[in-house]
């Protein structure tokens, strides 16, 4: 993969991850009023996503690029708006939307890793992307677990 194409892909991830940081921080603030533990989980996920932002920004710079200024401005605002909107729509809707967003990130990470492995290039970048991918899977599993808990609680109320 040529450098220009790789930088475009890394900028996509940079913007996506920036969006997720503010999305999950907004949700953390909303849901911690319902349940402190829930707020802490969203906050922790946001901090992990911030680590992804930092790692991707570092790789962009190592390749001679600069993290996109548009991403720095637009993604956080979109993340806050989406986080607040989804949070106000309720926990179940937020969890489902988050799961969908994480699934997109997983799919995109897998494709980029596959492309880089095919080229047999950028082993350090592949490792960073693989670590991010593991985190995205963990986030998805947590969202799924919380959805299952909500569904079980709903079923108990029916009985």
Regions found by a protein language model. Name each.
Residues 1-159:
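Iron-associated oxidoreductase/ferritin-like identity signal
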């Amino acid at each position: 993969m040529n450098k220009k194409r790789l930088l475009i892909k890394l900028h996509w991830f940079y913007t996506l991850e920036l969006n997720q940081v503010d999305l999950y921080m907004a949700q953390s603030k909303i849901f911690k009023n319902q349940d402190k533990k829930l707020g802490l989980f969203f906050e922790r996920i946001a901090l992990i996503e911030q680590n992804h932002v930092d790692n991707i920004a570092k790789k962009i710079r190592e390749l001679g690029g600069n993290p996109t200024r548009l991403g720095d401005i637009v993604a956080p605002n979109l993340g806050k708006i989406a986080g607040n909107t989804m949070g106000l729509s309720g926990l179940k809707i937020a969890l489902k939307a988050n799961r969908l967003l994480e699934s997109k990130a997983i799919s995109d990470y897998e494709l980029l890793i596959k492309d880089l492995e095919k080229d047999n290039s950028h082993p350090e970048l592949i490792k960073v992307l693989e670590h991010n991918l593991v985190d995205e899977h963990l986030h998805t599993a947590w969202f799924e677990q919380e959805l299952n808990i909500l569904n079980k609680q709903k079923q108990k109320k029916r009985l």
